[in-house]
């Protein structure tokens, strides 16, 4: 029985002025990829790099946040019913009403959209 090789965690490439950028393959997370956004978050406890992915599961849109903070990787997921949304410069998770989340997503600059909602 062959055991599949585990994918490596995506690497972070540091740019000038300590602004972290990353190149993550959306298929690393979900096949039904819709959009992604990268943001950098700072507060008095430190900084975090956050990648938010939107994928489609049937008629639902799924948000997935991948966070690199204090040398640790974490992630969380939510459907539109939970309305977790990430915005640069704010708390990593911002709860919005479902209609607001959809409207905010449509209007927010910086998303790389591959299909219309």
Curated annotation (Swiss-Prot):
Keywords in alphabetical order: Cytoplasm, Nucleus
Compartments in which it is found: Cytoplasm; Nucleus
Domain of life assignment: Eukaryota
GO CC annotation terms, alphabetical: cytoplasm; nucleus
Main location group: cytoplasm
Other remarks in the entry: Present with 952 molecules/cell in log phase SD medium.
Protein name: Uncharacterized protein YJR146W
């Amino acid at each position: 029985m062959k055991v599949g090789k585990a994918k490596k965690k995506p690497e972070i490439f540091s740019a000038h002025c300590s602004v972290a950028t990353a190149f993550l393959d959306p298929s690393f997370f979900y096949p039904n990829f819709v959009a992604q956004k990268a943001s950098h978050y700072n507060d008095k406890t430190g900084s975090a790099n956050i990648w938010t992915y939107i994928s489609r599961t049937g008629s639902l849109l799924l948000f997935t946040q991948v966070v690199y903070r204090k040398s640790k990787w974490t992630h969380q997921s939510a459907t539109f019913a939970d309305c977790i949304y990430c915005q640069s410069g704010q708390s990593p998770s911002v709860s919005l009403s479902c209609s607001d989340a959809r409207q905010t997503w449509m209007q927010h600059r910086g998303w790389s959209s591959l299909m219309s909602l």
